[in-house]
């Protein structure tokens, strides 16, 4: 009977014989790696709701200093869930003037309903239909935290507007145009426009803010 050391040695020798002539490249390893499984939209919504409840419990039990930390954590968790969790699921969903679908990838969605649906699914206590039909400024005012203001820009070129928004810092913002509304995502100075686009392919897109056709065609209101 072979001893354990001999078995290990035989295994090592066998592995050496079967080894390729050269180690795999990073590209080969990437191709061989299984694609990560993305959580479903429903799972993202449920996970965010669970996180929100846990944070609310900590907020209720904590003192002033702890409350500030929890609020900062909640803000970061919400931003991350919106940008990396909820919004990506909607990419490619068709736009329509009267689109009201509640599920990404099915039916059609109008720009206002896209914003209101995302906000509702993120945990905001809003009336989806009313917000979906409301003016962008009304949505902005209703979702702006106390002590914060709605930034307003008029007659400004897309590139300059992108720089002004980037100066506000990383995060996710709601932007209202004269005939349109959507989200602006800022990360490391990169400014993206995520919206149910009524131009070009007419689907939900994530595109460079300054180059977005909808920005070019619209006068920013806030």
Describe every region a protein language model picked out.
Residues 19:
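Short, conserved catalytic or interaction motifs in soluble domains
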Residues 14-16:
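C-terminal motif of bacterial Sec signal peptides marking the signal peptidase cleavage site
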Residues 208-222:
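Glycine-rich, aromatic-bearing surface loops/beta-hairpins
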Residues 3-10:
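Sec-dependent signal peptide recognition
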Residues 23-137:
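N-terminal capping segments
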Residues 133-205:
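...with weaker cross-activation on analogous glycine-rich loops/strands in unrelated enzymes
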Residues 97-101, 168, 205-210:
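N-terminal post-signal-peptidase region of extra-cytosolic proteins
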